[in-house]
């Protein structure tokens, strides 16, 4: 994949949603919660006012409505601004 986010944006691959509950109940796709955790795949160069803190390979937590979902080569990703990321874990 050859994609480079611009400015202060990052490309994140969301973690897989849970397939079943702790008690063993299988969760259908329509009822799955959107994951709030993912891996940073690529980062932009930042802006003159804001340096990029994130780097490729970081695992991050982000807000429920952060970014824009896209699909590349059959995989789902989210492009978001660095300040939409809540924490590095």
Swiss-Prot record:
Protein localization: Cytoplasm
Gene Ontology CC: one annotated term: cytoplasm
Molecular-function GO terms, alphabetical: ATP binding; metal ion binding; protein folding chaperone; protein-folding chaperone binding; unfolded protein binding
Biological process (GO), any one: chaperone cofactor-dependent protein refolding
Primary subcellular site in the record, as a coarse category: cytoplasm
Pfam families reported for this sequence: Cpn10 (PF00166)
Keywords, in A-Z order: Chaperone, Cytoplasm
Ranges that cross the membrane: none
InterPro entries: Chaperonin_GroES (IPR020818), Chaperonin_GroES_sf (IPR037124), Chaprnonin_Cpn10_CS (IPR018369), GroES-like_sf (IPR011032)
PANTHER family the UniProt entry points to: 10 KDA HEAT SHOCK PROTEIN (PTHR10772), CO-CHAPERONIN GROES (PTHR10772:SF58)
Summary of the function given for this chain in its UniProt record: Together with the chaperonin GroEL, plays an essential role in assisting protein folding. The GroEL-GroES system forms a nano-cage that allows encapsulation of the non-native substrate proteins and provides a physical environment optimized to promote and accelerate protein folding. GroES binds to the apical surface of the GroEL ring, thereby capping the opening of the GroEL channel.
Family: Belongs to the GroES chaperonin family.
Assembly behavior: Heptamer of 7 subunits arranged in a ring. Interacts with the chaperonin GroEL.
Name of the protein described by the UniProt record: Co-chaperonin GroES
Species per Swiss-Prot/TrEMBL record: Porphyromonas gingivalis (strain ATCC BAA-308 / W83)
